[in-house]
C-alpha cells in the first residue's frame, strides 16, 4: 500500500487535472454556441443563393456546357480533397477518425489540401499526397477564409490542374454522434441544383436575367461554393467542440472516480498508520510497566 503522503500528492495532482478538463469543457461549450450562432446568422443568405442558382440552372444552354458542370471523362482523374481537421487535440478520436476515413477513400495519386494544424502535422513529410504550401487554420471559421479556399479551388479546376475536388469533414448527426463525410465541390452536380418541375402559374417558373443566365450563374456559383466550404468548416468546428466537450466530460468523470478510489485508499492508509501508532504506544507502555 502506498504511503499516505504519496496518496495525498496523487489526489492533489488529479484534482488539478480535473480543474483543467472541466475548464476545457466549459470553453468548448462556449465556442460551440458561438459557432452555431455564427452559422445560423449566414445560413439564410446561402440558402437564398442556392435557391437563386436553382432558378438559373434550367436556363443555362446545354451547349456549350459551363466549365463548373464539365465532368472530364478520364481514366485517372486528378482528384483533390479539402480536408477539415482541428487545430488542437484532446478531442477524442475526432482527428483520427477523419484521417482514417480520408485514407480509406483516397487513391495513391490524389492530393490532400488540409485545413487544421493536427491534420497537417500528421501528414507533413509522411504522406506525399499532402500539398504542403496549402496551410489554413481551422479555429473560428470565417467567410474570408472560405472565399480564399474557394478561389484557389476554382482556379485549379478551371486550369485543368484538378479534375475533381471534394470536401472531407465531420458532420454532426445528432446531439451525441458525428461522423466523417465526403461531398463533391467541383464539378457541380447539375441535377442536384435543378429544382423539381413547378406547376403552371408558379411565380418561380419564369425568371428574367440580365444580361443572361450564363453571366448570372458565373457570378453566383462561386458564392454558392463559398457557402458549401464555410458550412463544412463551421460544422466541422462545431463537431470538434462537441467531441472535445465529450472527451473532457469523460476525463472529468474519470478523475472524480479516481479521486474517490484514492480517498478510500488514503483513509485506509491513515487508519492503518494510526492503528500501528496506537499499537506501538500500547506496546511501549506495557514494556515500561513490565520493567517497573
Question: Where on the chain are the PLM-derived regions?
Answer:
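C-terminal beta-strand-loop-alpha-helix "lid" module of Rossmann-like NAD(P)-dependent dehydrogenases
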Residues: 1-292
Amino acid at each position: 500500500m502506498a504511503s499516505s503522503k504519496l496518496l495525498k500528492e496523487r489526489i492533489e495532482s488529479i484534482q488539478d487535472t480535473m480543474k483543467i478538463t472541466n475548464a476545457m469543457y466549459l470553453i468548448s461549450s462556449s465556442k460551440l454556441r458561438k459557432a452555431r450562432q455564427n452559422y445560423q446568422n449566414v445560413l439564410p443568405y446561402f440558402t437564398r443563393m442556392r435557391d437563386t442558382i436553382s432558378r438559373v440552372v434550367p436556363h443555362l444552354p446545354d451547349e456549350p456546357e459551363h466549365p463548373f458542370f464539365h465532368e472530364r471523362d478520364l481514366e485517372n482523374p486528378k482528384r483533390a480533397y479539402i480536408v477539415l481537421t482541428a487545430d488542437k487535440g484532446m478531442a477524442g478520436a475526432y482527428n483520427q477518425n477523419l484521417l482514417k476515413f480520408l485514407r480509406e477513400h483516397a487513391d495513391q495519386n490524389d492530393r490532400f489540401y488540409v485545413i487544421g494544424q493536427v491534420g497537417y502535422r500528421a501528414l507533413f513529410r509522411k504522406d506525399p499526397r499532402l500539398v504542403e504550401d496549402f496551410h489554413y487554420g481551422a479555429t473560428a471559421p470565417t467567410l474570408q477564409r472560405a472565399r480564399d479556399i474557394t478561389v484557389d479551388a476554382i482556379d485549379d479546376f478551371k486550369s485543368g490542374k484538378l479534375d475533381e475536388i471534394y470536401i472531407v469533414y465531420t458532420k454532426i448527426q445528432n446531439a451525441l454522434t458525428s461522423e466523417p463525410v465526403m461531398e463533391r465541390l467541383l464539378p457541380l452536380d447539375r441535377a442536384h441544383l435543378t429544382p423539381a418541375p413547378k406547376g403552371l402559374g408558379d411565380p418561380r417558373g419564369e425568371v428574367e436575367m440580365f444580361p443572361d443566365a450564363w453571366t448570372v450563374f458565373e457570378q453566383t456559383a462561386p458564392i454558392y461554393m463559398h457557402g458549401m466550404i464555410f458550412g463544412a468548416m463551421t460544422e466541422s468546428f462545431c463537431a470538434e467542440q462537441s467531441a472535445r466537450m465529450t472527451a473532457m466530460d469523460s476525463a472529468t468523470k474519470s478523475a472524480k472516480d479516481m479521486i474517490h478510489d484514492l480517498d478510500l485508499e488514503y483513509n485506509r492508509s491513515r487508519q492503518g498508520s494510526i492503528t500501528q501508532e496506537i499499537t506501538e504506544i500500547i506496546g511501549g507502555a506495557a514494556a515500561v510497566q513490565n520493567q517497573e
